[in-house]
Amino acid sequence: MNVGVAHSEVNPNTRVMNSRGIWLTYALGVGMLHIVLLSIPFFSVPVVWTLTNVIHNFGMYVFMHAVKGTPFETPDQGKARLLTHWEQLDYGVQFTSSRKFFTISPIILYFLASFYTKYDTAHFVINTASLLSVLIPKLPQLHGVRIFGINKY
């Protein structure tokens, strides 16, 4: 360990999801979202699970697949300017532990939401559409692909 030495990452955005405690913080955040939604008196348990799933997946889509660039000035001459956070994650290397975690977490949440909604058709369709909206952009075949030119610039 180099004490007193600045990080040497050209783009710190590439390694932030490997930081100590980020997975626990992520899981606690999803749990807190669920508890807050459960505390709203007129929501039933199936509605809360569906809302937790949809809000989580919407947030994941926006922060991982829609927002591009880095939140700070980097010395990489703007190479990351046109990449989403998912494409920058772990320098674009596929099947790393962080990518697996952020791929499996919406699937686990989907299974929980489906179970607690008792596989009701309306909830099932909403949860499935929400899951597919975050899983399809994570596929390795879609790395750097902009469908119909959406989010190209």
Swiss-Prot record:
Chief place of localization: endoplasmic reticulum
Subcellular location(s) of the protein: Endoplasmic reticulum membrane
Domain of life, per lineage: Eukaryota
InterPro entries the UniProt entry points to: ORMDL
4Fe-4S recorded as keyword: no
Keywords: Endoplasmic reticulum, Membrane, Transmembrane, Transmembrane helix
Bilayer topology term: Multi-pass membrane protein
Gene Ontology biological-process entries: ceramide metabolic process; intracellular sphingolipid homeostasis; regulation of ceramide biosynthetic process; sphingolipid biosynthetic process
Record topological domains on the Cytoplasmic side: 1-27, 65-105, 141-153
Pfam families: ORMDL
GO cellular component: endoplasmic reticulum membrane; serine palmitoyltransferase complex
Residues annotated as transmembrane: 28-46, 47-64, 106-123, 124-140
Coiled-coil blocks: none
Family note: Belongs to the ORM family.
Domain commentary: Ceramides bind to ORMDL3 N-terminus and stabilize it in a conformation that physically restricts the accessibility of the substrates to their binding sites in the serine palmitoyltransferase (SPT) complex, hence inhibiting SPT catalytic activity. In the absence of ceramides, the N-terminus is flexible and permits substrate binding, thus liberating SPT from inhibition.
Function: Plays an essential role in the homeostatic regulation of sphingolipid de novo biosynthesis by modulating the activity of the serine palmitoyltransferase (SPT) in response to ceramide levels. When complexed to SPT, the binding of ceramides to its N-terminus stabilizes a conformation that block SPT substrate entry, hence preventing SPT catalytic activity. Through this mechanism, maintains ceramide levels at sufficient concentrations for the production of complex sphingolipids, but which prevents the accumulation of ceramides to levels that trigger apoptosis.
PANTHER family: ORMDL PROTEINS
Record note on quaternary structure: Ceramide-sensitive subunit of the serine palmitoyltransferase (SPT) complex, which is also composed of SPTLC1, SPTLC2/3 and SPTSSA/B.
Name of the protein in its database record: ORM1-like protein 1
Native source species: Danio rerio (Zebrafish)
